[in-house]
From Swiss-Prot:
This is 33 kDa chaperonin. Pfam families: HSP33. Coiled coil: none annotated. Redox regulated molecular chaperone. Protects both thermally unfolding and oxidatively damaged proteins from irreversible aggregation. Plays an important role in the bacterial defense system toward oxidative stress. One of its GO terms (cellular component) is cytoplasm. Under oxidizing conditions two disulfide bonds are formed involving the reactive cysteines. Under reducing conditions zinc is bound to the reactive cysteines and the protein is inactive. It is found in: Cytoplasm. Its main location: cytoplasm. Keywords: Chaperone, Cytoplasm, Disulfide bond, Redox-active center, Stress response, Zinc.
Length: 292
Protein backbone atom coordinates (compact mmCIF):
# COMPACT_ATOMS: atom_id res chain seq x y z
CA UNK A 1 0.00 0.00 0.00
CA UNK A 2 1.26 3.52 -0.70
CA UNK A 3 1.89 6.12 1.94
CA UNK A 4 -0.95 8.51 1.19
CA UNK A 5 -0.71 12.26 1.57
CA UNK A 6 2.74 12.46 0.07
CA UNK A 7 4.23 14.22 -2.93
CA UNK A 8 7.06 12.57 -4.88
CA UNK A 9 9.33 14.30 -7.38
CA UNK A 10 11.18 12.38 -10.06
CA UNK A 11 13.48 13.03 -13.02
CA UNK A 12 14.13 11.18 -16.25
CA UNK A 13 17.85 10.64 -16.72
CA UNK A 14 17.74 10.68 -20.52
CA UNK A 15 15.14 13.39 -21.09
CA UNK A 16 14.87 17.04 -20.01
CA UNK A 17 11.57 16.24 -18.31
CA UNK A 18 10.61 16.27 -14.65
CA UNK A 19 7.68 14.59 -12.97
CA UNK A 20 5.63 14.69 -9.81
CA UNK A 21 3.29 12.18 -8.23
CA UNK A 22 0.93 12.89 -5.34
CA UNK A 23 -1.73 10.93 -3.48
CA UNK A 24 -4.06 12.36 -0.84
CA UNK A 25 -6.60 10.79 1.47
CA UNK A 26 -6.53 12.19 5.01
CA UNK A 27 -6.00 15.75 3.76
CA UNK A 28 -8.95 15.38 1.41
CA UNK A 29 -11.12 13.90 4.15
CA UNK A 30 -10.40 16.85 6.45
CA UNK A 31 -11.38 19.30 3.72
CA UNK A 32 -14.67 17.46 3.17
CA UNK A 33 -15.47 16.71 6.83
CA UNK A 34 -17.06 20.03 7.74
CA UNK A 35 -19.44 20.11 4.79
CA UNK A 36 -22.17 18.10 3.08
CA UNK A 37 -21.20 18.55 -0.55
CA UNK A 38 -22.85 16.64 -3.41
CA UNK A 39 -20.58 13.94 -4.85
CA UNK A 40 -19.64 15.88 -8.02
CA UNK A 41 -18.46 18.79 -5.84
CA UNK A 42 -16.39 16.41 -3.70
CA UNK A 43 -14.77 15.14 -6.88
CA UNK A 44 -13.95 18.67 -8.07
CA UNK A 45 -12.39 19.54 -4.70
CA UNK A 46 -10.37 16.31 -4.80
CA UNK A 47 -9.08 17.18 -8.27
CA UNK A 48 -8.31 20.76 -7.21
CA UNK A 49 -6.41 19.50 -4.17
CA UNK A 50 -4.27 17.22 -6.30
CA UNK A 51 -3.69 19.97 -8.86
CA UNK A 52 -2.72 22.53 -6.21
CA UNK A 53 -0.23 20.14 -4.65
CA UNK A 54 1.34 19.42 -8.04
CA UNK A 55 1.46 23.11 -8.99
CA UNK A 56 2.91 24.12 -5.64
CA UNK A 57 5.74 21.65 -6.15
CA UNK A 58 6.73 23.43 -9.38
CA UNK A 59 7.41 26.67 -7.48
CA UNK A 60 11.03 27.46 -6.68
CA UNK A 61 10.37 29.77 -3.75
CA UNK A 62 8.57 29.95 -0.42
CA UNK A 63 5.03 31.23 -0.70
CA UNK A 64 1.36 30.48 -1.15
CA UNK A 65 -0.72 29.38 -4.10
CA UNK A 66 -4.48 29.50 -4.58
CA UNK A 67 -6.23 27.55 -7.32
CA UNK A 68 -9.90 28.33 -7.76
CA UNK A 69 -12.79 27.73 -10.09
CA UNK A 70 -15.52 30.34 -10.28
CA UNK A 71 -18.51 30.68 -12.55
CA UNK A 72 -22.24 31.21 -12.93
CA UNK A 73 -23.19 27.55 -12.47
CA UNK A 74 -24.48 25.81 -9.33
CA UNK A 75 -20.87 25.44 -8.15
CA UNK A 76 -20.12 29.16 -7.92
CA UNK A 77 -16.74 28.70 -6.24
CA UNK A 78 -14.29 25.91 -5.48
CA UNK A 79 -10.90 26.83 -4.07
CA UNK A 80 -7.81 25.21 -2.61
CA UNK A 81 -5.12 27.22 -0.80
CA UNK A 82 -1.68 25.69 -0.40
CA UNK A 83 1.94 26.60 0.26
CA UNK A 84 5.42 25.31 -0.48
CA UNK A 85 5.24 23.17 2.67
CA UNK A 86 2.31 21.29 1.10
CA UNK A 87 -0.12 22.57 3.73
CA UNK A 88 -3.58 22.65 2.17
CA UNK A 89 -7.12 23.79 2.87
CA UNK A 90 -10.17 24.18 0.66
CA UNK A 91 -13.85 25.04 0.40
CA UNK A 92 -16.68 25.16 -2.13
CA UNK A 93 -19.84 27.24 -2.46
CA UNK A 94 -22.91 25.57 -3.94
CA UNK A 95 -26.01 27.40 -5.16
CA UNK A 96 -28.81 25.27 -6.55
CA UNK A 97 -29.29 21.60 -7.30
CA UNK A 98 -26.50 19.49 -8.74
CA UNK A 99 -27.24 16.24 -10.62
CA UNK A 100 -25.18 13.20 -9.66
CA UNK A 101 -23.65 12.97 -13.13
CA UNK A 102 -22.75 16.66 -13.46
CA UNK A 103 -19.52 17.33 -15.33
CA UNK A 104 -17.20 20.30 -14.85
CA UNK A 105 -18.99 22.59 -17.31
CA UNK A 106 -22.41 21.74 -15.85
CA UNK A 107 -21.10 22.53 -12.37
CA UNK A 108 -19.25 25.77 -13.04
CA UNK A 109 -21.11 27.06 -16.10
CA UNK A 110 -19.43 30.01 -17.78
CA UNK A 111 -16.39 30.44 -15.62
CA UNK A 112 -12.69 30.81 -15.07
CA UNK A 113 -9.74 29.06 -13.55
CA UNK A 114 -7.82 31.54 -11.39
CA UNK A 115 -4.33 30.78 -10.09
CA UNK A 116 -2.81 33.22 -7.61
CA UNK A 117 0.82 32.88 -6.53
CA UNK A 118 1.98 34.94 -3.54
CA UNK A 119 5.72 34.64 -2.79
CA UNK A 120 6.94 35.48 0.69
CA UNK A 121 9.35 37.81 -1.10
CA UNK A 122 8.50 39.39 -4.41
CA UNK A 123 5.42 40.35 -6.35
CA UNK A 124 2.08 38.59 -6.34
CA UNK A 125 1.08 36.96 -9.62
CA UNK A 126 -2.38 36.01 -10.86
CA UNK A 127 -3.26 34.05 -13.99
CA UNK A 128 -6.80 33.67 -15.32
CA UNK A 129 -7.92 31.30 -18.08
CA UNK A 130 -11.40 30.53 -19.34
CA UNK A 131 -12.79 27.06 -18.74
CA UNK A 132 -12.40 25.84 -22.28
CA UNK A 133 -11.29 22.29 -21.48
CA UNK A 134 -13.64 19.47 -20.51
CA UNK A 135 -11.58 18.58 -17.44
CA UNK A 136 -9.66 20.45 -14.76
CA UNK A 137 -6.42 18.87 -16.02
CA UNK A 138 -7.06 20.22 -19.53
CA UNK A 139 -7.77 23.71 -18.16
CA UNK A 140 -4.53 23.64 -16.16
CA UNK A 141 -2.54 22.52 -19.18
CA UNK A 142 -4.01 25.50 -21.02
CA UNK A 143 -2.88 27.74 -18.15
CA UNK A 144 0.70 26.47 -18.38
CA UNK A 145 0.70 26.88 -22.15
CA UNK A 146 -0.43 30.50 -21.87
CA UNK A 147 1.58 31.58 -18.83
CA UNK A 148 4.82 29.63 -18.51
CA UNK A 149 4.91 28.31 -22.07
CA UNK A 150 6.37 25.06 -20.76
CA UNK A 151 4.89 21.87 -22.20
CA UNK A 152 3.02 20.39 -19.23
CA UNK A 153 0.65 17.46 -18.83
CA UNK A 154 -1.47 16.59 -15.79
CA UNK A 155 -3.15 13.29 -15.04
CA UNK A 156 -5.65 13.32 -12.17
CA UNK A 157 -7.51 10.33 -10.74
CA UNK A 158 -10.10 10.10 -7.95
CA UNK A 159 -11.68 7.18 -6.12
CA UNK A 160 -11.99 5.45 -2.77
CA UNK A 161 -9.48 3.49 -0.71
CA UNK A 162 -10.81 1.40 2.17
CA UNK A 163 -14.12 3.22 1.93
CA UNK A 164 -12.55 6.68 2.22
CA UNK A 165 -12.22 9.29 -0.54
CA UNK A 166 -8.80 9.46 -2.13
CA UNK A 167 -7.23 11.19 -5.09
CA UNK A 168 -3.94 11.21 -6.90
CA UNK A 169 -2.22 12.84 -9.80
CA UNK A 170 0.91 13.04 -11.89
CA UNK A 171 2.53 15.99 -13.64
CA UNK A 172 5.05 15.96 -16.45
CA UNK A 173 6.85 19.14 -17.46
CA UNK A 174 9.72 20.05 -19.75
CA UNK A 175 12.47 21.51 -17.60
CA UNK A 176 13.02 25.26 -18.04
CA UNK A 177 15.95 26.41 -20.19
CA UNK A 178 16.45 22.91 -21.55
CA UNK A 179 15.56 21.44 -24.89
CA UNK A 180 13.35 18.38 -24.84
CA UNK A 181 12.31 16.74 -28.07
CA UNK A 182 8.56 17.00 -28.56
CA UNK A 183 8.35 13.32 -29.48
CA UNK A 184 10.14 12.34 -26.26
CA UNK A 185 7.73 14.37 -24.13
CA UNK A 186 4.74 12.99 -26.03
CA UNK A 187 6.07 9.45 -25.53
CA UNK A 188 6.35 9.94 -21.76
CA UNK A 189 2.91 11.55 -21.65
CA UNK A 190 1.38 8.59 -23.49
CA UNK A 191 2.93 6.22 -20.96
CA UNK A 192 1.70 8.30 -18.02
CA UNK A 193 -1.82 8.55 -19.42
CA UNK A 194 -2.23 4.79 -19.02
CA UNK A 195 -2.18 5.03 -15.21
CA UNK A 196 -5.38 3.68 -13.68
CA UNK A 197 -7.02 5.09 -10.55
CA UNK A 198 -6.59 1.81 -8.70
CA UNK A 199 -2.87 1.71 -9.46
CA UNK A 200 -2.19 5.32 -8.52
CA UNK A 201 -4.22 5.16 -5.31
CA UNK A 202 -3.10 1.75 -4.04
CA UNK A 203 0.50 1.21 -5.18
CA UNK A 204 3.70 2.71 -3.73
CA UNK A 205 5.26 5.44 -5.86
CA UNK A 206 8.20 3.22 -6.98
CA UNK A 207 5.77 0.57 -8.23
CA UNK A 208 3.74 3.16 -10.14
CA UNK A 209 6.87 4.54 -11.81
CA UNK A 210 8.10 1.03 -12.61
CA UNK A 211 4.80 0.09 -14.24
CA UNK A 212 4.79 3.23 -16.35
CA UNK A 213 8.45 3.76 -17.17
CA UNK A 214 10.26 0.44 -16.66
CA UNK A 215 12.20 0.95 -19.90
CA UNK A 216 13.40 4.41 -18.82
CA UNK A 217 15.94 5.54 -16.22
CA UNK A 218 14.06 7.42 -13.50
CA UNK A 219 15.38 8.98 -10.29
CA UNK A 220 12.79 9.17 -7.48
CA UNK A 221 13.47 11.69 -4.71
CA UNK A 222 12.43 11.63 -1.06
CA UNK A 223 8.74 12.41 -0.57
CA UNK A 224 7.23 15.51 0.99
CA UNK A 225 4.24 15.13 3.31
CA UNK A 226 0.94 16.76 2.36
CA UNK A 227 -1.34 17.88 5.20
CA UNK A 228 -4.47 19.85 5.98
CA UNK A 229 -3.70 23.10 7.77
CA UNK A 230 -6.00 26.08 8.17
CA UNK A 231 -4.51 29.53 8.58
CA UNK A 232 -7.47 31.04 10.41
CA UNK A 233 -6.88 32.46 13.88
CA UNK A 234 -8.53 34.63 16.50
CA UNK A 235 -6.02 37.37 15.73
CA UNK A 236 -6.97 37.40 12.04
CA UNK A 237 -10.65 37.59 12.92
CA UNK A 238 -9.93 40.47 15.28
CA UNK A 239 -8.09 42.23 12.49
CA UNK A 240 -11.08 41.77 10.18
CA UNK A 241 -13.46 43.13 12.81
CA UNK A 242 -11.26 46.17 13.22
CA UNK A 243 -11.83 47.09 9.58
CA UNK A 244 -15.63 47.20 9.98
CA UNK A 245 -17.46 50.42 10.90
CA UNK A 246 -18.03 50.69 14.66
CA UNK A 247 -21.75 51.20 14.07
CA UNK A 248 -22.06 47.89 12.24
CA UNK A 249 -20.18 45.98 14.95
CA UNK A 250 -22.16 47.65 17.74
CA UNK A 251 -25.42 46.84 15.98
CA UNK A 252 -24.55 43.12 15.83
CA UNK A 253 -23.51 43.14 19.50
CA UNK A 254 -26.77 44.84 20.51
CA UNK A 255 -28.82 42.31 18.58
CA UNK A 256 -26.88 39.09 19.20
CA UNK A 257 -24.93 39.79 22.38
CA UNK A 258 -21.73 38.56 20.72
CA UNK A 259 -20.18 38.21 17.30
CA UNK A 260 -19.67 34.68 15.96
CA UNK A 261 -17.07 34.46 13.19
CA UNK A 262 -17.04 31.11 11.42
CA UNK A 263 -14.21 29.71 9.28
CA UNK A 264 -15.61 28.02 6.18
CA UNK A 265 -12.40 26.06 5.71
CA UNK A 266 -12.07 24.25 9.05
CA UNK A 267 -15.34 24.94 10.86
CA UNK A 268 -13.83 26.84 13.79
CA UNK A 269 -15.95 29.53 15.46
CA UNK A 270 -14.43 32.61 17.07
CA UNK A 271 -16.66 34.44 19.55
CA UNK A 272 -16.27 38.12 20.44
CA UNK A 273 -18.28 39.91 23.14
CA UNK A 274 -18.43 43.63 23.95
CA UNK A 275 -15.33 43.44 26.14
CA UNK A 276 -13.39 41.73 23.35
CA UNK A 277 -14.44 44.42 20.89
CA UNK A 278 -13.30 47.12 23.30
CA UNK A 279 -9.91 45.41 23.57
CA UNK A 280 -9.66 45.20 19.77
CA UNK A 281 -10.36 48.90 19.46
CA UNK A 282 -7.64 49.55 22.02
CA UNK A 283 -5.23 47.47 19.91
CA UNK A 284 -5.15 44.64 22.42
CA UNK A 285 -5.62 41.04 21.33
CA UNK A 286 -8.48 39.20 23.08
CA UNK A 287 -7.29 35.90 24.46
CA UNK A 288 -10.53 33.90 24.56
CA UNK A 289 -10.14 30.53 22.81
CA UNK A 290 -12.04 29.61 19.69
CA UNK A 291 -15.01 27.27 19.81
CA UNK A 292 -14.82 24.11 17.68
Amino acid sequence: MPQHDQLHRYLFENFAVRGELVTVSETLQQILDNHTYPQPVKTVLAELLVATSLLTATLKFAGDITVQLQGDGPLSLAVINGNNQQQMRGVARVQGDIPDNADLKTLVGNGYLVITITPEEGERYQGVVGLEGDTLAACLEDYFLRSEQLPTRLFIRTGDVDGKPAAGGMLLQVMPAQNAQAEDFDHLAMLTETIKSEELLTLPANDVLWRLYHEEEVTLYDPQDVEFKCTCSRERCAGALKTLPDEEVDSILAEEGEIDMHCDYCGNHYLFNAMDIAEIRNNASPADPQVH
